[in-house]
Amino acid sequence: MSSIIDYPLVTEKAMDEMDFQNKLQFIVDIDAAKPEIRDVVESEYDVTVVDVNTQITPEAEKKATVKLSAEDDAQDVASRIGVF
């Protein structure tokens, strides 16, 4: 992974969003900004990012939810990065 993306988040909610909303979730560097997250995801995974939402978790980690364009399939990207 890059210095911004720590690891993909694999939870039941993340899997539902991947299946039904074409979204992926990552734990990212706490100081990463949304444009930086967008650029890294687009360059590393060769996809088009439509939207990025971030949250700070109770464990003091930053969670980024990345919505992919309709042309890109979140399940294909997840299988390429080893989520399955």
UniProtKB/Swiss-Prot annotation:
<dbReference type="GO" id="GO:1990904">
    <property type="term" value="C:ribonucleoprotein complex"/>
</dbReference>
<dbReference type="GO" id="GO:0019843">
    <property type="term" value="F:rRNA binding"/>
</dbReference>
<dbReference type="GO" id="GO:0006412">
    <property type="term" value="P:translation"/>
</dbReference>
<keyword id="KW-0689">Ribosomal protein</keyword>
<keyword id="KW-0694">RNA-binding</keyword>
<comment type="function">
    <text>Binds to 23S rRNA. One of the proteins that surrounds the polypeptide exit tunnel on the outside of the ribosome.</text>
</comment>
<comment type="similarity">
    <text>Belongs to the universal ribosomal protein uL23 family.</text>
</comment>
<comment type="subunit">
    <text>Part of the 50S ribosomal subunit. Contacts protein L29.</text>
</comment>
<dbReference type="InterPro" id="IPR001014">
    <property type="entry name" value="Ribosomal_uL23_CS"/>
</dbReference>
<dbReference type="InterPro" id="IPR012677">
    <property type="entry name" value="Nucleotide-bd_a/b_plait_sf"/>
</dbReference>
<dbReference type="InterPro" id="IPR012678">
    <property type="entry name" value="Ribosomal_uL23/eL15/eS24_sf"/>
</dbReference>
<dbReference type="GO" id="GO:0005840">
    <property type="term" value="C:ribosome"/>
</dbReference>
<keyword id="KW-0699">rRNA-binding</keyword>
<dbReference type="Pfam" id="PF00276">
    <property type="entry name" value="Ribosomal_L23"/>
</dbReference>
<dbReference type="InterPro" id="IPR013025">
    <property type="entry name" value="Ribosomal_uL23-like"/>
</dbReference>
<protein>
    <recommendedName>
        <fullName>Large ribosomal subunit protein uL23</fullName>
    </recommendedName>
</protein>
<dbReference type="InterPro" id="IPR019985">
    <property type="entry name" value="Ribosomal_uL23"/>
</dbReference>
<keyword id="KW-0687">Ribonucleoprotein</keyword>
<dbReference type="GO" id="GO:0003735">
    <property type="term" value="F:structural constituent of ribosome"/>
</dbReference>
